[in-house]
């Protein structure tokens, strides 16, 4: 059972291993929303995400015999690092099962904390089922990433910090995957101040919590395909679900394209790297009528490899018409390319790639195809 005493105990314990992330006021988002928007940057946490909170508190509640058997968990990356880091602090062995699509940075960092990593399955649920098999076979103690009240209590320590720093907060906006984070955040928020509105945000293509709330019970999605890999969960936890039903005011959905835009905004306006799952709260702001209110958006993590970052930035620039390509046919004679370049320069465009093809088949004699990729101000 989640009690105020449990949250208070968890808050004291996690201070040993966490960075008390201070709220960051966002001028940019505040202007966009007409509200006072603050960011809770858990991407700046020691393991790059909030998950260390729940993992450390959960392991602290285990007996020495349970720890000595070795720990195992399944994770899309951030819980993996949390468990690996916490296990190292407690001096116990950890085995982590991760989906094969997990970003390399999360795999390598998990290994860097001394854990054994097993890659299995395409999504979290596949990895989870395999981890359960290994736990039963080898007698490991399973540390669930979200369907555990001790884990949820650890995650809820975020609320304690938010309310201590901003007692008059009106809204807390929370990324949602399996439901552990929002369970802890919402339950403690309602204990401390029932007037605080807690809003959960899911990827539209992995809306397992929304589906469960609509059905009145946990349901399993057929698929969970989203760039927000940390929240790609087919079914939420049944142990934490009643707390979500009771304490969460609203759920919102965000498309992948909106996450791409939010990533670009975060990089350009806040100079911060936040992974796609961690941006769900920010991407949903435009759906919330919060004018004149104080809003805290939890940025749940920032573990992202540079290849993924590069791809997201490129897609974001294309999405906003800041990078685009055109093809033109030109007479194959001197001076034509200069004229094209001058026209682009006059419109303040910047050529970043140029392909000149003299072998294109056209009905024009002596023509060449010019394919130009350029950068512009866009939208």
For the regions a language model picked out, list residue spans one by one.
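PLP-dependent amino-acid enzyme catalytic core
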Residues: 1-379
């Amino acid at each position: 059972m989640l009690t105020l005493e449990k949250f208070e105990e968890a808050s004291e314990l996690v201070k040993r291993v966490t960075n008390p992330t201070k709220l960051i006021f966002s001028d940019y988002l505040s202007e966009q929303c007409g509200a006072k928007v603050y960011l809770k940057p858990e991407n700046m946490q020691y393991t790059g995400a909030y998950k260390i909170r729940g993992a450390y508190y959960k392991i602290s509640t285990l007996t020495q015999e349970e720890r000595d058997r070795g720990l195992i968990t399944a994770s899309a990356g951030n819980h993996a690092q949390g468990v690996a880091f916490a296990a190292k602090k407690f001096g116990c062995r950890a085995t982590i099962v991760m989906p094969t699509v997990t970003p390399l940075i999360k795999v390598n960092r998990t290994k860097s904390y001394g854990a054994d990593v097993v890659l299995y399955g395409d999504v979290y649920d596949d990895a989870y089922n395999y981890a359960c098999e290994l736990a039963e076979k080898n007698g490991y103690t399973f540390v669930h990433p979200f369907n555990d009240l001790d884990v949820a209590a650890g995650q809820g320590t975020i609320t304690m910090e938010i309310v201590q720093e901003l007692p008059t907060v009106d809204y807390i906006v929370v990324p949602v995957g399996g439901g552990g984070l929002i369970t802890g955040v919402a339950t403690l928020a309602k204990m401390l101040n029932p007037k605080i509105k807690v809003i959960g945000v899911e990827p539209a293509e992995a809306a397992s919590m929304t589906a469960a709330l609509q059905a009145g019970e946990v349901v399993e999605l057929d698929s969970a395909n989203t760039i927000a890999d940390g929240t790609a969960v087919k079914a939420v936890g049944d142990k934490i679900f009643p707390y979500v039903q009771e304490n969460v005011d609203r759920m919102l959905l965000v498309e992948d394209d909106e996450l791409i835009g939010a990533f670009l905004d975060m990089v350009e306006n806040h100079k911060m790297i936040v992974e796609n799952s961690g941006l769900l709260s920010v991407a949903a702001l435009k759906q919330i009528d919060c004018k004149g209110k104080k809003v805290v958006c939890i940025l749940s993590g920032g573990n992202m490899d540079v290849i993924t970052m590069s791809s997201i930035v490129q897609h974001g620039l294309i999405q906003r018409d800041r990078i685009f390509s055109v093809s033109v046919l030109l007479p194959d004679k001197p001076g034509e390319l200069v004229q094209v370049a001058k026209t682009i320069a006059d419109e303040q465009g910047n050529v970043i790639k140029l392909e000149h093809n003299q072998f294109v088949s056209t009905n024009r004699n002596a023509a060449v195809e010019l394919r130009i990729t350029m950068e512009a101000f866009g939208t």
